[in-house]
Each structure stands twice: as structure tokens, then as C-alpha cells.
Regions:
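Conserved lysine of the Walker
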Residues: 12
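Small-molecule kinase domains that catalyze NTP-dependent phosphoryl transfer to phosphate-bearing small molecules
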Residues: 87-149
Length: 149
């Protein structure tokens, strides 16, 4: 399970959708999952439920990518990511309550601090062949390649 986390508007969906499509793996977007479950509860319990829901969906496949805010360490723990990508591309979001709640992660595998050019993204991913790798090697290689952008 690969988690792409960060403030709303930081580029989680942009990156997750492209990675999912490129590698033909599921991308679970938290906003879309909330729509499916008609759950827009953003208090502590609602956020915990969303984190657990995202984990269950991500575990349906051997490799999956999920994008959601994960504002607190506990929610990140609930998700149990194999790899975490922190989209640290903005200082604050349009949602003041989320800005106040969000704690930058202490543990992550990759921190992205600038917007990624789409052509550069696809060029760096070009030689990763998911069909010849186990999930751990794929996740490791993905983090290495993205880290070079």
C-alpha cells in the first residue's frame, strides 16, 4: 500500500491518478471514497473511520495507491502504509480546520516539495516494469525514481 498524503490541494490526486493509470493499479482517492459512502464527517471519529476505510480498500489488491490528507500520526498508523509519499507543495489549504489539525509527518519515504512536470513524471517512470517486480521492489524503485524529480 502506497500512501500519498498532504494538505488538500497539494497534488495528491494529480500524482495518484497518474501513477495508478501508468501502472494499471488501483488509486483510491479519499474524496471519491467519501462520496461512495456518503460520509462527510470530518471530526475525529469520522477521520478515523475514513482512514480505516481507506486501508480496507487499499488491501483489496496486492499493489494500490491511496491519496488522502491523513492530518495526524494516528490516522497514518491506522492506514498502515508500506510507503508514504508526503506532498509538501503548499503551506496551507483552503480549509482552515484542516490547516490547524495537520501535523507534518516525522516518518515518510519521500517528501515532494515542488510541483512535478507531467512529462518528467512519465519519463522517470518509463523503465519501471511492474510485471517483473515483486511489490517491495516496485515500491522501493518507485520512491527512488520519484525522488530524482
Amino acid at each position: 500500500k502506497i500512501l500519498i498524503m498532504g494538505l488538500p490541494g497539494s497534488g495528491k490526486t494529480w500524482l495518484g491518478e497518474r501513477l495508478g493509470k501508468h501502472f494499471n493499479v488501483p488509486y483510491w482517492d479519499a474524496d471519491e471514497v467519501r462520496k461512495i459512502y456518503s460520509n462527510w464527517d470530518f471530526d475525529q471519529k469520522g477521520r478515523e473511520q475514513q482512514s480505516l476505510r481507506m486501508r480496507k480498500l487499499a488491501e483489496l489488491d496486492e499493489i494500490s495507491i491511496s491519496g488522502f490528507v491523513c492530518p495526524l500520526p494516528g490516522y497514518r498508523t491506522f492506514f498502515m502504509a508500506d510507503k508514504t509519499i508526503w506532498m509538501d507543495t503548499i503551506d496551507k489549504s483552503e480549509y482552515e480546520d484542516t490547516n490547524k489539525l495537520f501535523m507534518p509527518p516525522e516518518k515518510y519515504d519521500l517528501r515532494i516539495t515542488k510541483w512535478i512536470d507531467e512529462n518528467q513524471l512519465y519519463n522517470c517512470l518509463g523503465d519501471i516494469n511492474l510485471g517483473t517486480m515483486d511489490t517491495q521492489n516496485f515500491s522501493d524503485e518507485l520512491i527512488v525514481k520519484l525522488g530524482k524529480l
